[in-house]
């Protein structure tokens, strides 16, 4: 439909202030280095507040005590969130031990937060510890460059322990894509690692002086698992194998979930199929997609700046043709692929070379020593003896990967002793939330702190209707920016106000359909009342193997979203 009325390739008009900031920043330096030495405030001032995002950090404060501090005439309790760049979520046990120590010694909350972007975050880093965290990461071969703001963010890769050989190849491509699309500015090394300034002019051959119009997310996905939720991402490489070997990728472009409440110019969108490419064209095509979005993306309105809106404005075929022109290739027809699920298989799975992989369920990805549940200590003890690696999944879980038969019993014993293998029901395994309160400045309603007890109540509803071992893919996100990926869930809750959510129904288990808003601005008891009725019908009327989301569509409870740019809000 979008091909019939293509819009302008470049949106004319007054540029946003973010564009001015990027030009003025001297390739992302700003005055961050000077600001670090200002002890009068715990935060970063002016442009630096936003510029630190390009260096992988967000300035936050503890919203639980914001009003109390204001009464005391104190500034908010500023602290930084730092997000590591970790393509494919792979981290060595040596690196894990370093981040465990930093979290314990130098953050307010003492936790490691696994995210659905397949990396980890530190919350609560005081300004005095900001430079040390970057130096600690560098000392173990990690960094936080380009994990936030208008760049290609952390590249995801299916954490598939079944296809170990294919995973190894796909993971290498995730790393290559991440490295290829990194900014070239030396600002990160100069500010955080004390590297000397070089008397040359910075050049950004791919990203340009003003970087991208908005955040940009990339995945490498191995069917039939859609664990990385490709339709939440701008650019997706779907692995195509022949005889167990990776031969190329299907490219899908223009997914994204972020919306604004009540703004009908915003919508969630699934990614569009562009075609198949052999492996040798991967980096050229990745660069071509990014530079096309760089040049054509809307820099006059950040709420309309993501790749999904560019595709709808110029037309999918026009965008695709430009990618072909820039990359010097012609897309081949899409090769057959299918997604059957996206959850992690909790427990032991045998891979190649007689190595085992243990997937541990980590509720909400929050790793901390709780009373009677010493999760953080348990993982540290495993890291001390495990010779393989850890893999963070896009479902916020953790895989102890590459365990030899001789170590299996020892690692399982440690996991069990530290409550890391306490069994949970399928509903809890298939539920996810973003961080939200108390640290996220955008939060409108609780998410991470709300989900565990809400899941208890959903489990009770399933049990009441005789299906205690069933599950609904359930996501809670504290605001419509959508970090919790609620707009690809069978049941998605989007925070509207404290204690109130918009309820979306009609996604599916494989994550290929956007759910539609079913009820607006309702409370937890109202959500559970609705769910009681809907689950009762699902239990009685469903067809064999029919998931909750598919049932709500087939039964006419909700209309499917078929063309989001036009029917998402209907």
Curated annotation (Swiss-Prot):
GO cellular component, as recorded: sulfite reductase complex (NADPH)
Binding site for siroheme: 483
PROSITE patterns: NIR_SIR
Pfam families reported in the protein's UniProt record: NIR_SIR (PF01077), NIR_SIR_ferr (PF03460)
The EC number(s) this enzyme carries: 1.8.1.2
A biological process term (GO) from this entry: cysteine biosynthetic process
Keyword Cell inner membrane: no
Pathways per UniProt: Sulfur metabolism; hydrogen sulfide biosynthesis; hydrogen sulfide from sulfite (NADPH route): step 1/1
Cofactor note text: Binds 1 siroheme per subunit.
Keywords: 4Fe-4S, Amino-acid biosynthesis, Cysteine biosynthesis, Heme, Iron, Iron-sulfur, Metal-binding, NADP, Oxidoreductase
Free-text function comment from the UniProt entry: Component of the sulfite reductase complex that catalyzes the 6-electron reduction of sulfite to sulfide. This is one of several activities required for the biosynthesis of L-cysteine from sulfate.
Assembly information from the UniProt record: Alpha(8)-beta(8). The alpha component is a flavoprotein, the beta component is a hemoprotein.
PANTHER family linked to this entry: SULFITE REDUCTASE [NADPH] SUBUNIT BETA, SULFITE REDUCTASE [NADPH] SUBUNIT BETA-RELATED
Family, similarity comment: Belongs to the nitrite and sulfite reductase 4Fe-4S domain family.
Protein name: Sulfite reductase [NADPH] hemoprotein beta-component
Species name: Enterobacter sp. (strain 638)
């Amino acid at each position: 439909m979008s091909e019939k009325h293509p819009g302008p390739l470049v949106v004319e008009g007054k540029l946003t202030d973010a564009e001015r900031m990027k030009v003025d920043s001297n390739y992302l330096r700003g005055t961050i280095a000077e600001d670090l030495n200002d002890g009068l405030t715990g935060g970063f001032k002016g442009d630096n507040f936003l510029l630190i995002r390009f260096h992988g950090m967000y300035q936050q404060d503890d919203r639980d005590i914001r009003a109390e501090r204001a009464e005391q005439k104190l500034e908010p309790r500023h602290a930084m969130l730092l997000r590591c760049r970790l393509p494919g979520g792979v981290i060595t046990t040596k690196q894990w031990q370093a981040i465990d120590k930093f979290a314990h010694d130098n953050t307010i909350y003492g936790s490691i937060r696994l995210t659905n972007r397949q990396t980890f975050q530190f919350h609560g880093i005081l300004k005095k510890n900001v430079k040390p965290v970057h130096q600690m990461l560098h000392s173990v071969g990690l960094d936080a460059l380009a994990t936030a703001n208008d760049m290609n963010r952390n590249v995801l890769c299916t954490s598939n322990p079944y296809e170990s050989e294919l995973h190894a190849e796909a993971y290498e491509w995730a790393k290559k894509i991440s490295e290829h699309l990194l900014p070239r500015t030396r600002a990160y090394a100069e500010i955080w690692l004390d590297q000397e300034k070089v008397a040359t002019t910075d050049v950004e051959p791919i990203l340009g002086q003003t970087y991208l119009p908005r955040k940009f997310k990339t995945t490498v996905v191995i069917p039939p698992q859609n664990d990385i939720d490709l339709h939440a991402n701008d650019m997706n490489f779907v692995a195509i194998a022949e005889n167990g070997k990776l031969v190329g990728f299907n490219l899908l472009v223009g997914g994204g979930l972020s919306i604004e409440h009540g703004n009908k110019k915003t919508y969630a969108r699934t990614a569009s199929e562009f075609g198949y490419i052999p492996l040798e064209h991967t980096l050229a095509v990745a660069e071509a997609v990014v530079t096309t979005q760089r040049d054509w993306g809307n820099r006059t309105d950040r709420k309309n700046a993501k790749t999904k809106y560019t595709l709808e404005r110029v037309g999918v075929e026009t965008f695709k043709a430009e990618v072909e022109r820039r990359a010097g290739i012609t897309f081949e027809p899409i090769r057959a692929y299918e997604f059957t699920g996206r959850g992690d298989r909790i427990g032991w799975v045998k891979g190649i070379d007689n190595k085992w992989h243990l997937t541990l369920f980590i509720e909400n990805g929050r790793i901390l020593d709780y009373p009677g549940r010493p999760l953080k200590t348990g993982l540290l003890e495993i890291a001390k003896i495990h010779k393989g690696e850890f893999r963070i999944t896009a479902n916020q879980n953790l895989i102890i990967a590459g365990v030899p038969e001789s170590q299996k019993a020892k690692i399982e014993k440690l996991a069990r002793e530290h409550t890391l293998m306490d069994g949970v029901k399928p509903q809890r395994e298939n539920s996810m939330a973003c961080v939200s309160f108390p640290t996220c400045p955008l939060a409108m309603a609780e998410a991470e702190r709300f989900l565990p007890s809400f899941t208890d109540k959903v489990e009770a509803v399933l049990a009441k209707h005789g299906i205690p071992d069933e599950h609904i893919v359930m996501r809670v996100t504290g605001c419509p920016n959508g970090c919790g990926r609620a707009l690809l869930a069978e049941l998605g809750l989007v925070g509207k106000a404290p204690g109130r959510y918009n309820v979306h129904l009609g996604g599916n288990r494989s994550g290929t359909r956007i759910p539609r808003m079913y009820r607006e601005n309702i409370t937890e008891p109202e959500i559970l009342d609705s769910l009681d009725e809907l689950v009762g019908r699902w239990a009685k009327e469903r067809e064999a193997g029919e998931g909750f989301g598919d049932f709500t569509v087939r039964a006419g409870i909700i209309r499917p979203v078929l063309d989001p740019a036009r029917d998402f809000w209907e």
